[in-house]
Design a protein with these regions (language model features):
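Short, ordered loop/turn segments at secondary-structure junctions
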Residues: 37, 114, 144-146, 187, ...
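Generic structural signal for helix capping and beta-alpha/helix-loop junctions
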Residues: 42, 94-96, 118, 149, ...
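Small/aliphatic-rich secondary-structure junction motif
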Residues: 1-53, 153-219, 234, 238-240, ...
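Structural beta-alpha unit
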Residues: 68, 72-109, 210-241, 247-255, ...
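Local beta-strand N-terminus motif with an aromatic residue
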Residues: 1, 105-107, 128, 137, ...
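A short acidic, glycine-rich active-site loop
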Residues: 53-68
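Short beta-strand elements of ligand-binding domains
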Residues: 111-113, 138-144, 271-275
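Glycine-rich, Arg-bearing micro-motifs that act as flexible, cationic patches
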Residues: 111-130, 243-266
Length: 277
């Protein structure tokens, strides 16, 4: 997590993401890059206002405004470090951020979620959701003001499949960075019910295979995997959820927006996600 990208539209949620990212970077001598993407408006030529002149004026105004806002953020939230660089780029938000991640060898993206629906928006249709779907590096989604130093309990919903090796190693590194307890979680549902004897055996084998330390093993019964993750996290007062997205198995369909609104809106903690194949 040495090179952290924070896409920034200067909203409160973007500021919270920046503060979280800056704290991480201070802890490992890393760097934060603030990126503001300016959407280019479509303007037709006219006698009164040539398109090129309007576009140049608009882009200059947007860049000047972004530079001023960047300076305020750095002065207020990163006066004592870490290293913060800023970029203003032009184009459609998602492809521009995607290209930036690939070209600049970003290791982590930290994004704010926004809107009254909170994590509902994160899962359905927002820029955050779009970026989570394609991003080749981990993404941490921040809903509210959160101190990185407060992350002490990480919930890892797992299918316990053998093909989760790369994911699990990344989450172990995440746990090590935060010096947190890792709560391995298997959700037992009526549609895919397994006995406690079977589940406990699989959990113990999983922990042994990956040589886990400072962890708990948990089976949680609920009507759906989505509800189970949300309810378990609330019950143990989890500080972060870490999970895969967009895979063909397991919990990938968490991104489909099927979590009941009255459950997901009460999840306040950050979510770490990584796109698997």
């Amino acid at each position: 997590m040495k090179k952290i990208l924070v896409p920034c539209d200067f909203s409160d949620s973007a500021v919270q993401a920046f503060k979280f990212a800056a704290e991480i970077a201070r802890g490992n001598n890393g760097e934060v890059i603030l990126l503001n993407v300016v959407e280019i408006p479509v303007v037709h030529d006219s006698v009164m206002m040539p398109a090129l002149t309007y576009e140049e004026t608009y882009l200059k105004e947007m860049k000047d405004r972004a530079d001023r806002d960047f300076a305020k953020m750095k002065s207020k939230w990163a006066k004592d470090g870490p290293k913060v660089t800023t970029q203003v780029q032009y184009g459609a938000t998602t492809p521009t951020i995607s290209r930036f991640v690939e070209e600049n060898k970003i290791s982590l993206v930290v994004m704010g979620t926004k809107g009254a629906s909170g994590l509902k928006e994160f899962f359905v249709g927002s820029n955050t959701e779009k970026i989570v779907r394609w991003c080749p590096v981990p993404v941490i989604s921040i809903k509210n003001a959160t101190k990185a130093s407060s992350i002490k309990n990480i919930v890892f919903p797992s299918t316990l499949h053998k093909d989760e090796e790369e994911l699990t190693m990344k989450i172990k590194a995440l746990q090590d960075f935060f010096k947190a307890t890792l709560h391995i979680l298997y959700i037992n549902t009526p549609a895919n019910f397994r006995t406690d004897v079977v589940n406990r055996k699989m959990l113990n084998e999983f922990a042994k295979r990956f040589m886990l330390k400072n962890f708990t093993l948990n089976v949680y019964n609920d009507l759906s995997e989505e509800a189970g993750v949300a309810n378990f996290t609330k019950e143990i007062k989890g500080d972060m959820i870490a999970m895969a997205t967009h895979g063909r198995k397991g919990l990938s369909h968490l991104m489909s927006g099927s979590i009941a609104e009255d459950v997901v809106n009460h999840i306040e903690c950050p979510i770490w996600t990584w796109k698997t194949n």
